[in-house]
Amino acid sequence: MPDDVLYSFPSSPTPDLSEWAGSPVGVSNTITRTKGRTTVHNKTVDGTPGLLERLISSAHGHLNAIDGRHPVYQHDVMIHGIRVRATTNSDHLFDFWKDNWFSLREWQRTTGQAPPGEPSVHVYALHGVKGEQVAAYYSHDTNTIAFFNTSYYGQLKSWVLGAVGRILAAEYGIHSIHGACVEKSGKGVLYIAPTGTGKSTSSYGLMDYPKTRFHSDDWVYVRYTYQTRDGRRVFVIRVEGTDGTKARGYQVYRWIEGHKNDAKARLRAMTLSNQVLDLTLEDLDLARPLVAYAYTSEKVFYLRTNLVENFPLSAHQILSSKEENVPNVSSAFLAQHGKTLDGVIRDLRAARDGELHRMFSLKSDTELADLCARLIAFDNARSMLDITKVLPADRVFANPMEPVKLAAVVLLKRSADDPTVLEHLSLDDFMERLLIGETPDKKHETAYNAYRAVDDKAERAFIETRQKEALASGTPLYQLFSQRDGKPVSLDEEFELFRVMYQATHCYDLNTTLQKDPRVRDKREAVSRTMRVIARTLDEEPKGIHLSIDNYNSYVD
């Protein structure tokens, strides 16, 4: 490997493959030709007459052509009660798909709930398809996803979550969040953040505290609940007033706000465990506040292998798992990251865990450095990690229908120019952050969620027009957003649910840049101090708080 190259991937044995074996690490290591989002990606298939039919025809034509010559896998899974069917001829995608999600049998065994009779979402993920580009397509009208000639699991997972999320919002008022969640002393904290701001670090870091349980690493389902007069917590999925007006899914919250006196309005609701109830509006105790509950989505977490940089002890299980796109590293990379690798190795050598000690005791520091360097070199290298093998089973939410009560929502950012460390957000500020969705590289992801199955261009055009109006008038962006007609339905869904989230939780802004504090020695101390800020905030749920780089010490010391 040339000295100026930091890492590289083994070449494909033939130019037509979309996946092949990488240099050994973990249980397996699959290299995918596409290692990120496909250049061609279309979430507005329904806007082009005949396109969906052509895509389905192409998929079935390819399946017929390879019938009997290559394995084709069809596997149904359950994602928060929604049944999803994937059809693929990719060994890698099938392998990760069945590991990632609950099968129908696993869902029923774990939750005690029977799966639906038929899938609501259909997925085709096929490689070797002649006449098709490396591309991804989504039809909202038919809940159909088609991926051609790409084996990168990350995009497949994200688009499936997005498609399921649209169903849950429209039909059930359930909010799908690209975020991570941890419980501490019975209170849940939900982190919402773009990549590169410390979401995983903040999640795993909080696990060093007592009375904590790990909930979610990447995706969370949130239900906003009312209390009934007999003490049950329910979320309303449909309502019909005595005046004939109706609402369903995400629309029910505002409808109830506007019809509080319609005591005989009929409601269809569900309990936290999915028991269906028929109620009237007078059965709800509307004097009680809304409460948010979060549910996990994945059976086994698909996460970045560079987790070992901040949490070295995770290396044991990551190296005992299936990998995707873990590269080889050069001597230049090892030299450039020597200090970081020395710290990781030091922690691994000091670990008292018996299995971990056995795995690493026979390896030299040079071998360990190379292994760990491979895990942290490429930002999109992934592992399929069973978190119950990293943490004790009683410290993990393993049942997808066991909720955690959310107390705090934390929007993470990493802005070196902003002296703010922690701030309790107003509704306008909370919504503006999510509408603009600025990432560390100055791009924009609405709701910090690139997974959403929406017309991104139409949404961004609507938001940017409102931003210009806000700049010219001085009116807060969210107020203009709320007042203007013509917003895409997907934006209406998303931000109505965020409005309800603000009512049901305490919402904060956290800037993960304590390394710029001259009193902080290194990154590890910065992470430790950030964890103390989060832990105290979750314990106390302070209102109106504003901490800066100059005064936050009194909060954590």
What are the functions of these language-model segments?
Residues 146-165, 528-543:
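Ampiphathic alpha-helical segments that act as solvent-exposed interaction surfaces
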Residues 154-178, 183:
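N-terminal pre-Walker A segment at the start of P-loop NTPase domains
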Residues 1-157, 450-451, 555-557:
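Long, basic/Gly/Ser/Thr-rich N-terminal segments
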